[in-house]
Amino acid sequence: MSAQKCFESLVDEKVPVGKPAGLYQPCLVVGGLVYVSGHLPVQPDGGLILGCLGKDLDVEAGKNAARRAGLASLVTLEHCLGSLDKISRVVKLLGMVAATNSFTQHPAVINGCSELYAEVWGPENG
């Protein structure tokens, strides 16, 4: 299944295309690579998932938030490129996590986005 078809099958609710909150491009193609700006975890109703891991949110809630941020990034990529099929693989994922000082499970949280990308492009390319 193509990346675009896979993405379409995963999105059960519309994720709104975000608008830049400053002077930056949501995505930019340079030398055969596409760079996508940071994304927030947008809920189906357009609200944000907010909270602090280790205080307000547990690992599963954080993982879901990372997946939602990943979905938002995919919507931006689709909007900018026309199709996710134009992307052959993910080279880098940078995730930022709001957490207490004692929280140590950051990789488990960011896996929410990593697993989404692996679903779209396959485990070797996602």
Q: Where are the language model's segments positioned?
A:
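N-terminal presequence-like segments and the immediate start of the first folded domain
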Residues: 1-94, 99-126
